[in-house]
């Protein structure tokens, strides 16, 4: 329709001249044409008023599409989109983006994309690929990419999963260019360019052009254009004066036509048909024939695009609107037809161009004839006016001819003219269109209209040319700028190459920067433009240009001279082929490097058959010539003909085949033999290497997998024991917490009997108060607020301690678990390793030869690792023996000790050395005893490490523990006559070791030194043999040392008179010496007893039995020291502190039982009776507590003891040095405090004061008596255990209440009196055995302990020797568990560990010393002292008197002598065991009554008050 319609406008004139149908038919024709061709009909009636009205209506919708001209889109080509598509996309983008915006919103883009008819899923995928910056809006390159992808999808091509790298790079660079090219001021853009003064050189062209250019910039005012037309029409009529007469109607039609021109201009406000026609005229002035063709051709197709380029940015929208409507073509054709007629005289030139297109040559002749009449005159009038004149004249002719016979002419002419016209018009347009295609660098043909100024450029840029750039500007017309393409045309390339050769005088193949600068400045462009052009051309950035780069630069200059912009990036069309190839290669290399060299294979669309399906199979062999096939086939035929299966073979053929087969078989045999020999050599070489490696491994490695399995099994066994041990440890901590609260409770009751813990609200400070408490608080009298607060504090402290301990246990558990996990991870073998081990270590699942070789390797391993295996066995044996030793019952341990003692002196010495060594002597044990000692040492080490984890340091008592260890080993050898020497030595060692504790208070060093000298002579040999049992004793000693140090910190310092200080110092030195002697005596038997208590080898049990007892005994001893020697470590303060509280009860019991001098005697009786009843046991032979109890007694010392108990004492009786001498002698003669066995049997307390006298008296008995005493003691041991535990607990609790009175009464005697007491006490020893009741008292112990406990402590001082015997016996073990639960336990602990006995002894001397400093100690217990005196008389009501001094015992202590005796005896009470024996004495001892009478008559109590 469009083409035929255009043709109608062109074809009217010639035929109308020949055929002139009548006008009525013309009218019919005009109406009939519209029916077939709507637009042509309008054109035909363009002179009528109706057409003028309909033309605007047809274009009413077109102007609504307004482009956003403010968008600054860089002129960059996207290589994957054609130039035509990119123009369309840009137009669509400009129309959719509102003014002021640079990007298209998501909603707008979705509306546009939905028009494509694709599914939302596909569009969503396209959006994901297009929205590169993920901003939700699309810039132009992204929008173009999205439309391109839509086109792909519409064509059925699959969308790429990932945007191709090349596309992505181009789009991204386009986006960057947009972001960086924010529009600048136009004045800045034009600055330094030859276009800055356009008006100057445009004014030279002529007024019509300048007048037309002015309206073009402002928006094409129609008035100026119509005026020019009018002036042109004014001359036309003059030129056609003759015709005017003949065409009267034409004039009228002309007038109508002129009126039609005005509305035509109105309809084309935004379009520019008049400028196109005017330029057509201009074209005629340039070239005769070509110009007309150039003007006509472009206007017929996309005419609006030409004015768009020539006129600048303002013309672009005008050109695009008619392009989309398609309605302008008919109007333009009508306008162009007269142009052609107006140029009819030049038709010959046009015919040459249109030869292919015009099939009717008469058409041109008709034009010539018609225009010869007067059309040439109009052409001469002016370039613009004659065009319009011819146009109008043509219209007049058309109108006239239409009136005559238009009906047939259109049909015939329409068929011919459109073809010729349309063919030529697209030809010119299509030639320029390919220029936009990428990659056609240097191969683009010259556009039809030609490129303006090329020849001038060649002349201006020649080296010796004198022309200037102004000449170039004159030639460069904007009219033909639309023909300037992006790509370089062939003609351009030839011109630029000639220029390059002219400037490259040296034939170097390049032009350097200086020469290029001279060439480029000839263009007259500004510096800024030339810099941009150089940057784009010099792609290698080397400062010089080769031929292709020079051509690119010249082309950019040419474009800029034509008014086109310089691109920000070099478009694909201008990239030289060599550079493009290099860039593509580099991009592919970069991409391959990014992907790690892996070749990306994209899934191609299967719309077409893929070439891969026709490729050869790789499994096929390469090319094989036909000759080979022939040979192979012939050989196969021959072979087939000669096979043995063929029946037609002759005998010769068969023989031949046999020979051939034999030859082949022999050859195969030879090859097999060679291979076998080679493989054998390789196997032998490998075997030799394996042998060498195995030898190296055997010499340096361990058991490997076997050791791992053994260690893993051991780890699992150990891990199973950990939970039970931790549970026991938690139980011990719980018990300790409970016992500490009980201890505080008993202490508070002793201080205030009316205090009731049930009334104390432990939950918070604001507890409930009853009426009495409130009244007491109001009146300030009485009340138990202090006691309540102490109790609450004790409960809180116990809870916090328990929490801390439990936290430490948890930390230990977590540490153990982590260690276990780490070890198991390293030791565990995977299934794969296990399989490999069975296969290659044991030879399972392999061939016989390999299995034999594996066996040989195993033999080699066994031969190479005998020493290691033995050492491993030894270590495992030693570990198992140590583990066994931990579980050995006390009987076994005692047997070991007995055997050890019976061993020869050499054996003993070796044992000592072995024990002292750190496990090094494990292989040198000659007896079970030595190994048992080693096991104990190992246990001690483990205990020390565990205690360190709990935060308890054991370094302080380490040397002491070693010495005690030596003592324990040496004491068990009573068969030799060395006991006196051993005990003496031990006595020397202990005083020195106890020096630190003695330092706590001022000590009379003279006494200590003298005592050390006297004891050293007797006990020298004792130290070394006792080293074996160091561990357990050292642990307990460490516990006590730590506790004493803590108590020292808690005790407030008290100041006293100088006399008091001296007395306390002397007493303390004596106390420490006595303590050391008692400890030495007890140390040997205690180690076995501890083992007995440790029957379960669990760590928790051991810790419970050792740590709890040690702490309590330390507390008891320290309290005794503090209370008896108030000067430096005042006892009152110690009593208030919790750690020291457990010791106070024992001290109180000792001090509150002054009337118990007879108790020692009584205690010996039950021991002897039990000994006679039960046969001697061999395991107790070496135990000093079980030796013969019937030994000669030193009557002098016994009498001294009696005097001391009765209160008749000399001034010097209290000297500790004498007591310690007697103590030293006792163990020497009795071996191990035999007198203690006589006095107290199996009791576990260790009163050091009496122990000293008893030991001194017992030193004289013969060896036979020692053995008898040991046997009797062993028999009595079991019976006394129960009594001890019950009596000690109860007695200790009661003794605390009565502690102060006894102390106050005993403290008064002077040092001289004390010494006299000591001398008198010696004779008292014989009486002690007599009064001791047998086991009978044991049952009574529970009931009497509350009141009786005080008496036992007193005798314990003087009966100290017997006390040690009890602790050494089995009883100590049972006591350990009981100790933690109640306060009394502390005393038993000392009994177990020789350490406790020592502390009790010192307290005795300290008590008298404390008299001078009564304020400190008595301050707390000052009130109680008075009561003790009265209760003493009521001996029978012992239970009722617990709060005060026990009935019978208290009386004697009240007297000065008795008090001194009591004070001396009190120290021994530190060990609970004496309490049990004393309880028995209390029930039926007459001596107690005597003591009571003495107590009642004593004045000590009065003094204390």
From Swiss-Prot:
Keywords: Actin-binding, Cell membrane, Coiled coil, Cytoplasm, Cytoskeleton, Endocytosis, Endosome, Membrane, Repeat
Biased composition (Polar residues): 364-393, 403-413, 588-604, 872-885, 1086-1096, 1193-1208, 1283-1319
Annotated source species: Lodderomyces elongisporus (strain ATCC 11503 / CBS 2605 / JCM 1781 / NBRC 1676 / NRRL YB-4239)
Matching PANTHER family: ACTIN CYTOSKELETON-REGULATORY COMPLEX PROTEIN PAN1, EH DOMAIN
Stretches assigned to the EH domain: 85-174, 492-581
Full protein name: Actin cytoskeleton-regulatory complex protein PAN1
Keyword Coiled coil belongs to the record: yes
Residue ranges with Low complexity bias: 1133-1175, 1321-1330, 1454-1472
Start and end residues of each WH2 domain: 1474-1491
Basic and acidic residues: compositionally biased ranges: 960-980, 1034-1050, 1069-1079, 1109-1123, 1261-1280
């Amino acid at each position: 329709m469009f083409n035929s319609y255009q043709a109608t406008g062109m074809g009217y004139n010639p035929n109308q001249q020949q055929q002139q149908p009548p006008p009525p038919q013309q009218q019919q024709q005009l109406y009939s044409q519209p029916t077939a061709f709507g637009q042509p009909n309008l054109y035909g009636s363009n002179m009528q008023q109706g057409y003028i009205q309909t033309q605007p209506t047809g274009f009413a919708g077109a102007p609504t599409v307004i482009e956003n001209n403010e968008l600054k889109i860089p002129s960059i080509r996207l290589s994957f989109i054609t130039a035509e598509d990119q123009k369309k996309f840009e137009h669509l983008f400009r129309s959719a983006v509102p003014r002021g915006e640079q990007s298209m919103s998501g909603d707008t883009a979705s509306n546009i994309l939905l028009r494509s008819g694709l599914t939302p899923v596909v569009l969503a995928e396209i959006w994901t690929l297009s929205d590169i910056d993920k901003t939700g809006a699309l810039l132009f390159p992204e929008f173009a990419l999205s439309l391109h992808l839509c086109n792909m999808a519409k064509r059925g091509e699959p969308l790429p999963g990932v945007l191709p790298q090349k596309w992505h790079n181009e789009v991204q660079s386009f986006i960057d260019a947009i972001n960086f090219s924010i529009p600048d001021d136009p004045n800045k853009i034009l600055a330094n360019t030859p276009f800055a003064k356009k008006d100057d050189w445009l004014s030279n062209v002529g007024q019509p052009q300048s007048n037309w250019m002015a309206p073009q910039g402002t928006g094409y005012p129609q008035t100026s254009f119509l005026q020019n037309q009018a002036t042109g029409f004014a001359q036309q009529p003059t030129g056609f004066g003759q015709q005017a007469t003949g065409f009267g109607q034409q004039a009228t039609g002309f007038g109508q036509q002129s009126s039609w021109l005005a509305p035509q201009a109105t309809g084309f406000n935004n379009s520019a048909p008049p400028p196109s026609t005017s330029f057509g005229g201009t074209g005629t002035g340039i070239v005769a024939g070509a110009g007309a063709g150039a003007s006509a051709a472009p206007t017929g197709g996309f005419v609006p695009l030409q004015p768009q380029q020539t006129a600048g940015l303002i013309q672009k929208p005008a050109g695009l609107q008619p392009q989309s409507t398609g309605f302008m073509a008919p109007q333009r054709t009508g306008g162009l037809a007269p142009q052609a007629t107006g140029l009819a005289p030049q038709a010959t030139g046009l015919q040459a161009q249109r030869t292919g297109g015009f099939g009717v040559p008469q058409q041109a002749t008709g034009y010539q004839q018609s225009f010869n009449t007067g059309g040439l005159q109009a052409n001469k009038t002016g370039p613009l006016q004659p065009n319009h004149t011819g146009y109008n004249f043509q219209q007049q002719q058309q109108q006239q001819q239409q009136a005559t016979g238009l009906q047939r002419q259109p049909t015939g002419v329409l068929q011919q003219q459109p073809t010729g016209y349309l063919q030529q018009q697209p030809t010119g347009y299509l030639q320029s269109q390919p220029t936009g295609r990428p990659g056609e660098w240097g191969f683009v043909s010259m556009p039809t209209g030609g490129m303006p100024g090329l020849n001038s450029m060649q002349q201006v840029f020649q080296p010796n040319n004198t022309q200037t750039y102004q000449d170039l500007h004159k030639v460069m017309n904007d009219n033909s700028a639309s023909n300037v393409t992006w790509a370089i045309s062939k003609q351009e390339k030839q011109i630029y190459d000639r220029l390059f050769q002219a400037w490259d005088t040296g034939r170097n193949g390049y032009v350097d920067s200086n020469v290029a600068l001279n060439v480029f400045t000839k263009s007259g462009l500004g510096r800024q433009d030339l810099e941009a052009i150089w940057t784009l051309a010099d792609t290698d950035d080397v400062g010089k240009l080769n031929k292709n780069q020079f051509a690119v630069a010249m082309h950019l200059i040419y474009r800029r001279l034509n008014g086109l912009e310089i691109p920000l990036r070099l478009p694909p069309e201008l990239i030289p082929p060599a550079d493009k190839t290099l860039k593509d290669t580099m991009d592919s290399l970069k991409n391959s490097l990014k992907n790690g060299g892996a070749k990306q294979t994209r899934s191609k669309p299967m719309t077409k058959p893929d070439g891969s399906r026709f490729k050869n199979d790789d499994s096929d062999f390469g090319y094989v010539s036909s000759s080979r096939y022939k040979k192979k086939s012939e050989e196969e035929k021959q072979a087939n003909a000669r096979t043995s299966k063929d029946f037609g073979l002759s005998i010769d053929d068969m023989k031949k085949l046999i020979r051939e087969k034999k030859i082949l078989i022999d050859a195969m045999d030879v090859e097999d033999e060679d291979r076998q020999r080679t493989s054998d050599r390789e196997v032998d070489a490998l075997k030799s290497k394996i042998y060498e490696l195995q030898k190296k491994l055997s010499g340096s490695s361990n058991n490997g997998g076997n050791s791992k399995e053994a260690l893993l099994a051991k780890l699992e066994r150990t891990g199973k024991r950990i939970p039970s041990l931790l549970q026991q440890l938690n139980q011990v901590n719980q018990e300790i917490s409970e016992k500490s609260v009980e201890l505080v409770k008993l202490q508070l009751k002793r201080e205030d009997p009316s205090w009731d813990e049930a009334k104390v609200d432990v939950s918070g400070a604001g507890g409930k108060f009853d009426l009495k408490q409130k009244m007491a608080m109001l009146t300030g009298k009485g009340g138990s607020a202090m006691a309540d607060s102490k109790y609450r504090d004790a409960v809180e402290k116990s809870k916090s301690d328990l929490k801390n301990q439990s936290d430490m246990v948890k930390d230990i558990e977590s540490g153990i678990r982590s260690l276990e996990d780490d070890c198991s991870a390293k030791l565990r073998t995977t299934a794969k390793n296990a399989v490999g081990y069975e296969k290659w270590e044991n030879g399972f699942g392999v061939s016989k030869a390999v299995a034999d070789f594996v066996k040989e390797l195993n033999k080699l391993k066994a031969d190479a690792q005998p020493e290691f295996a033995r050492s491993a066995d030894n270590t495992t044996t030693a570990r198992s023996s140590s583990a066994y030793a931990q579980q050995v019952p006390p009987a076994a341990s005692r047997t070991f000790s007995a055997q050890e003692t019976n061993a020869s002196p050499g054996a003993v010495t070796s044992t000592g050395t072995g024990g002292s060594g750190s496990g090094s002597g494990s292989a040198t044990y000659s007896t079970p005893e030595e190994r048992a000692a080693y096991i104990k040492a190992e246990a001690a080490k483990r205990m020390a490490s565990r205690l360190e984890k709990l935060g308890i340091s054991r370094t302080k008592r380490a040397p002491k523990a070693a010495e005690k260890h030596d003592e324990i080993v040496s004491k068990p050898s009573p068969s030799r006559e060395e006991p006196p020497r051993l005990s003496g030595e031990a006595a020397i060692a202990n005083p020195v070791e106890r020096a630190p504790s003695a330092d706590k208070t001022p000590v009379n060093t003279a006494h200590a030194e003298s005592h050390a000298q006297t004891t050293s002579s007797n006990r020298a040999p004792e130290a070394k043999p006792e080293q074996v049992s160091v561990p357990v004793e050292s642990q307990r000693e460490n516990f006590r040392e730590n506790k004493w140090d803590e108590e020292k910190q808690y005790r407030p310092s008290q100041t006293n008179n100088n006399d008091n200080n001296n007395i306390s110092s002397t007493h303390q030195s004596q106390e420490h010496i006595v303590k050391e002697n008692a400890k030495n005596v007890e140390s040997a038997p205690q180690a076995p007893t501890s083992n007995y208590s440790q029957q379960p080898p669990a760590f928790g049990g051991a810790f419970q039995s050792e740590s709890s007892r040690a702490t309590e005994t330390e507390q008891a001893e320290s309290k005794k020291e503090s209370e008896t020697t108030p000067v430096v470590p005042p006892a009152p303060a110690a009593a208030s502190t919790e750690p020291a509280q457990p010791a106070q009860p024992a001290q109180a019991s000792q001090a509150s039982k002054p009337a118990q001098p007879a108790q020692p005697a009584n205690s010996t009786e039950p021991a002897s009776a039990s000994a006679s009843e039960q046969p001697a046991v061999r395991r107790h032979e070496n135990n000093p507590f079980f030796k013969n109890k019937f030994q000669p007694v030193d009557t002098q010392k016994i009498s001294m003891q009696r005097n001391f108990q009765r209160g008749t004492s000399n001034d010097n009786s209290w000297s500790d040095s004498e007591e310690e001498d007697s103590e030293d002698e006792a163990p020497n003669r009795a071996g191990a405090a035999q007198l203690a066995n006589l006095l107290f049997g199996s009791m576990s307390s260790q009163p050091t004061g009496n122990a000293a006298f008893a030991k001194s008296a017992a030193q004289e008995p013969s060896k036979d008596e020692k053995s008898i005493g040991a046997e009797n003691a062993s028999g009595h041991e079991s019976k006394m255990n129960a009594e001890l535990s019950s009596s000690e607990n109860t007695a200790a609790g009661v003794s605390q209440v009565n502690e102060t009175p006894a102390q106050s009464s005993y403290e008064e005697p002077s040092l001289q009196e004390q010494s006299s007491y000591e001398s008198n006490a010696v004779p008292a020893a014989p009486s002690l055995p007599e009064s001791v009741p047998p086991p009978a008292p044991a049952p009574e112990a529970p009931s009497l302990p509350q009141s009786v406990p005080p008496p036992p402590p007193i005798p314990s001082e003087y009966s100290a020797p017997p006390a040690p015997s009890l602790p050494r016996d089995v009883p100590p073990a049972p006591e350990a568990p009981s100790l933690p639960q109640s306060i009394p336990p502390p005393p038993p602990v000392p009994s177990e560990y020789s350490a406790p006995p020592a502390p009790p002894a010192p307290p005795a001397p300290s008590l008298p010393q404390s008299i001078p400093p009564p304020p400190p100690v008595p301050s707390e217990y000052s009130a109680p002292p008075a009561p003790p005196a009265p209760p003493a008389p009521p001996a029978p009501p012992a239970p009722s008197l617990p709060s005060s001094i026990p009935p019978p015992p208290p009386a004697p202590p009240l007297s000065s002598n008795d008090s001194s005796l009591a004070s001396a005896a009190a120290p021994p009470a530190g060990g609970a065991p004496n309490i049990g024996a004393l309880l028995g004495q209390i029930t039926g001892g007459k001596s107690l009554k005597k003591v009571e009478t003495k107590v009642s008559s004593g004045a000590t109590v009065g003094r204390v008050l």
